[in-house]
Amino acid sequence: RYPALEGIMIAGYATKFAQAIDLTILSELPNLHSLSVNICEGRGYLIDFSKFRLKEFSGAWFSHYQGLESLIELEVLRLSAYKAANLEALSHMSLLHTLVLWDSHVPSLAGIERCTRLKDMDLFRVKGLTDLSPLAQHPSLERLHLLSNRHLTQVQALNTCPKLRKLCIEKCKHVADIVTLEGATEIARITLDQVQSISFLPELPKLEFVYLEDVFDC
C-alpha cells in the first residue's frame, strides 16, 4: 500500500496489549531502509530482523528481538539497552560506517574489528567495558567519542588507528594509560573531561583543537 515509504519511526511508551504486536510485518515494505523503534518498554512488540533489508536502525534492543546479525546491509546502527558478551553480532555488517552504543552492557568490543568501513563510533555508558583492544589498527576509524564508561581503564589500542582524527573522552575517570595516546599522532581535534593527565598533548603534531575540563593533573 505504501511502496515509496523509506523510513519509519516508532516512539513512546508501550501499552500492555492482549497479544504482542509483531513489527516484522513492516519488512514487507519494499523500499523501507530506515527503522527507528524507541519504545521505553518493548515487551509488547516483536521484531525479527532477519526479514528486513535495512540500511539504518535506531532503538533499544530487547532480549526477545531476533536477527540483529542478519542486518548485513546496515550502514548506521544506534543501539541502546544491548546486553551481550561482545559485538560479534555486528561482525558481518561490512558496510557499517556509524555505530552509537549507549546504556548497554558489553564487556568486549570483539567483532567490531571486522567492520572495516566503520568511521564514526560513540560509546556512552557501556557497562563492563574495560579496554578498546579490538580497535587496534582499525583501518578506517576517524572519530571516537567515549562518555561515562566507568569500567574503562585501557585506551592504548587507539595509538595504532591510522585515521583517527577526532577523539573525545569524557567522564571516564579510571583510564590509567591515557598518556599512551602520545602515539596517536593523527589526532587533530581532542576533547578531554575528567582525565588523569594531558602531558601527552605536546606529542600530537597535527593537533588543531583542544577542549579541556576537570583535568586532574596538568
Where does each model-flagged region fall?
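Concave beta-strand-loop units of leucine-rich repeat
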Residues: 1-27, 31-67, 73-88, 92-108, ...
